[in-house]
Amino acid sequence: LCEGLARAAQGAGAQVHPGGTYLCMEGPQFSTRAESELYRSWGAHVIGMTNLQEAKLAREAEICFATIALATDYDCWNHSAGDVEIEQVIKVLSDNVKLAQRIIRGAVRHFPPERSCACATALKDAIITERAKIPKKARKELKLIIGKYL
């Protein structure tokens, strides 16, 4: 998935940096200069506010997931880039939406019809409760996501 997205991003004209560490912070807000320096010292490459939850939920739903992190600004550690201005972020965000659409259009053409990755069975060992002790109501509510394990 990641390789296909990287190829599609390059094909859409994006500058691509495969890999990296994503730091999820509480938002909506911009980092202070001290926070920004701390995140850099930890080795964070991208700072955002939503990706952690999305990645966890995708794993729990056994959905293949990869991040396309389209930067809107340099965090405030980069003194030469100046302070982050909301108007600039909104403009770049708008451009990034169009770029993301091109990337996704290019990527979906190359996805295999069947998956053979571990994502499809990520929950196979997650249920510890004896199956007989799982109430009918809970089974019904969870059927869509974990029905194959019940």
Q: Where do the model's predicted regions map?
A:
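Short, conserved interaction/coordination micro-motifs, predominantly
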Residues: 100
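Short amphipathic alpha-helical/adjacent loop interface patches that line ligand
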Residues: 97
